[in-house]
């Protein structure tokens, strides 16, 4: 204050959170430069000849760990400030040059095929219009119709015309990215100038697999001091493939994931998981919390309601907390703040008044006032503990696994309670879940004001119901693209088999007989889909044919090996898979790579506490709980599985539907219009 009164000098503090084990010996260069920039701004705005700046490191509790004062003249501040700006000025100029070249190439861009498939041109017009009007579009596009090209091409045209600033192509699974990558590869054959980036999960990109902290990872230490030069190098490369991004990250010793996050700011197209745009815990804040000049193309959008519910839900697992508390007690002692905070939450869970009817799960109308308080305190204690470096090796993984659901639970409790149900599971050590019911309201809010959002899928059907589930407004367009393939190319036959849970043991014999008859009558390559692993194994024991069986846990190499039997020329193949799994969506087996599929059951989700709570919610809000909670998700999985058969105009094949319910009008209404089902 004395310096300010004299208007000759001013002290400018930059206070930073210190997460290291030992007090710092010197300020981190980026932190010092931040303080210098503030000092320069003070000198300019107040006409000061000099300024005192100070970097102060404190713990989360406010304890000072280090102070580094420095006196600089106004000229020294100006010189350092300009040195910081220069790389960004070079970046802005490079981006502008690229944008001019990109827009010129996009103006000349032509559709990547000689002719549009039926409905493709109309779909492209709908996508372009949605971007131009900044509206949402809900589109049902049968499998094999070239949906990636039909959505990316008009979006890129809009990008070149300045109707949007970036295009994000969102997928539910890694396997579903290939269609977008193939479409971009075909467009690149026209000398397209485009920075297209693919974001993989952080754990998949990590080359060190150590704790993500500067004290443990050399790539994390000083990352943001080195990434400016790396970004400049990337701007001189047209191909932003995962391999090239990783190579530049390796060259500059950068974290590949954080480097990709930085590149997101200037990329033209980003292909990534739903989470990076929609999950409040992990979405790219530098993009979606600031600019709205972004277009979303959301593939396999029928997954969105369930995925959004998962994103918005959170839990407090009493049993998991007890196990972690034991580890923390051994490592840090029972007086450690984290141990005490976990004890408070465990005690709060134990004190909940559960029904005395002997049930092991259910719902709670509300939670005590102090429950949220102790959960918030535990989250703070977790964050403090992650800064400490006493022996955490045994608890490191469990710490994160427990922290993330807890943080999600705390976020959920801060939202409108009417959008949630409080569930409890397990009587001895209960798990308490804040279960999100309303995905529509959140999706509507998250996409409000963006430069067009297109939700598309082969199973976004019936469109009015799906638009309702995703919070679409009445003026948001719906478009049903007709199948471009002759219906007679796909022979669909239904056989009455009672696959309901109580009859599965006896149904296995008939299912095995039907599979055997099909592959004997017409040898070839077939996929058989079951509603569960248990049903699959039960039938496999009765099937006297050589076959491969999907496992619960399969990495990418195992999945590729599983599909090798189909991608090799000639021969026969028979595989038993789970409906709704990785082999029923997002895989492309054209031509003679796949001759047919068998679908056992109608795909209804397993009856459990969560589905029953959803059913009751939809019964109250939409009038038909069973339709929205069970039938729609089930038939969407069935349609996806059958969609594996016909991928091109010349493909032919068969689909065998084994369940008597396929003859019911309620289920027939949920089938695609181009299906011709015989008995």
Regions from the language model: what does each represent?
Residues 132-154:
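Walker A/P-loop
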Residues 245-265, 270, 281-287, 381-499, ...:
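A contiguous, basic/glycine-rich beta-loop/short-helix subdomain that forms a polymer-engagement track
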Residues 496-506, 552-663:
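Conserved RecA-like P-loop NTPase helicase motor core
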Residues 103-106, 110, 163-270, 278, ...:
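A substrate-engagement module of RecA-like helicase motors
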Residues 531-553:
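Conserved helicase motor "Helicase C" RecA-like lobe of SF1/SF2 P-loop NTPases
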Residues 1-7, 11:
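Single conserved hydrophobic/aromatic residue that forms the stacking wall/gate
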Residues 151, 178, 252-269, 273-377, ...:
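Signature of the SF2 helicase/ATPase Hel1-core->accessory helical subdomain module
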Residues 97-140:
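Conserved pre-motif I regulatory segment
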């Amino acid at each position: 204050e004395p310096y300010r009164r004299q208007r000759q000098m001013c002290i400018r503090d930059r206070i930073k959170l210190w997460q290291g084990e030992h007090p710092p010996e010197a300020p981190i260069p980026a932190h010092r430069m931040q303080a210098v920039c503030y000092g320069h701004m003070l000198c300019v705005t107040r006409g000061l000849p000099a300024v005192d700046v100070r970097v102060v490191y404190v713990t989360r509790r406010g304890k000072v760990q280090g102070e580094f004062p420095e006196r600089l003249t106004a000229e020294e501040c100006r010189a350092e400030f300009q040195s910081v700006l220069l790389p960004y000025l070079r970046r802005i100029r490079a981006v502008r040059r690229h944008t001019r070249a990109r827009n010129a190439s996009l103006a000349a861009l032509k559709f990547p095929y000689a002719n549009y498939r039926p409905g493709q041109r109309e779909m492209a017009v709908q996508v372009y219009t949605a971007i131009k009007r900044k509206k949402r579009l809900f589109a049902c596009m049968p499998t094999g119709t070239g949906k990636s090209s039909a959505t990316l091409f008009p979006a890129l045209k809009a990008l070149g015309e300045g109707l949007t600033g970036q295009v994000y192509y969102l997928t539910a699974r890694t396997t579903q990215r290939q269609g977008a990558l193939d479409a971009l590869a075909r467009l690149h054959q026209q000398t397209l100038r485009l920075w297209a980036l693919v974001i993989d999960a952080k754990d998949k990109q990590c080359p060190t697999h150590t704790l993500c902290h500067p004290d443990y990872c050399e790539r994390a230490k000083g990352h943001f001091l080195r990434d400016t030069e790396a970004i400049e190098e990337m701007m001189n490369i047209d191909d932003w493939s995962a391999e090239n991004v990783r190579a530049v990250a390796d060259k500059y010793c950068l974290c590949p994931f954080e480097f990709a996050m930085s590149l997101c700011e200037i990329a033209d197209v980003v292909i990534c998981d739903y989470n990076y745009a929609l999950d409040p815990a992990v979405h790219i804040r530098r993009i979606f919390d600031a600019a709205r000049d972004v277009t979303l193309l959301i593939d396999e959008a029928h997954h969105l309601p369930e995925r959004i519910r998962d994103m918005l839900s959170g839990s407090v697992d009493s049993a998991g907390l007890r196990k972690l508390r034991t580890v923390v007690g051994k490592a840090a002692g029972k007086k450690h703040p984290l141990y005490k905070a976990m004890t408070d939450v465990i005690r709060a869970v134990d004190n909940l008044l559960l029904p005395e009817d002997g049930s092991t799960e259910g719902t709670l109308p509300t939670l005590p006032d102090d429950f949220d308080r102790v959960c918030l305190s535990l989250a703070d204690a977790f964050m403090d503990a992650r800064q400490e470096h006493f022996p955490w090796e045994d608890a490191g993984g469990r710490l994160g696994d427990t922290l993330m659901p807890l943080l999600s639970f705390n976020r959920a409790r801060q939202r409108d309670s009417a959008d949630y149900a409080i569930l409890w599971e397990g009587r001895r050590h209960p798990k308490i879940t804040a279960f999100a019911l309303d995905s529509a309201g959140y999706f509507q809010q998250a996409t409000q004001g963006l430069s067009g959002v297109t939700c598309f899928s082969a199973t976004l059907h019936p469109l009015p119901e799906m638009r309702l589930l995703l919070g679409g407004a009445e003026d948001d367009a719906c478009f049903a693209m007709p199948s471009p393939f002759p219906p007679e190319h796909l022979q669909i036959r239904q056989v009455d088999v009672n696959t309901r849970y109580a009859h599965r043991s006896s149904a296995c014999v008939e299912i095995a007989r039907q599979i055997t008859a099909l592959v004997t009558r017409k040898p070839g390559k077939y996929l058989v889909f079951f509603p569960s692993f248990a049903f699959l194994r039960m039938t496999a024991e009765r099937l006297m044919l050589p076959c491969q069986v999907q496992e619960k846990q399969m990495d990418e190499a195992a999945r590729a090996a599983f599909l090798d039997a189909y991608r090799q020329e000639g021969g026969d193949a028979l595989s038993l898979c789970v409906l709704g799994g990785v082999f029923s969506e997002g895989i492309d087996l054209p031509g003679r790579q796949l001759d047919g599929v068998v679908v056992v059951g109608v795909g209804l989700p397993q009856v459990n506490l969560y589905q029953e709570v959803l059913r009751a919610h939809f019964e109250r809000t939409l009038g038909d709980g069973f339709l929205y909670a069970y039938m729609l998700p089930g038939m969407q999985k069935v349609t996806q599985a059958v969609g594996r058969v016909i991928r091109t105009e010349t493909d032919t094949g068969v689909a065998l539907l084994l369940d008597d319910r396929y003859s019911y009008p309620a289920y027939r209404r949920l089938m695609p219009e181009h299906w011709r089902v015989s008995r």
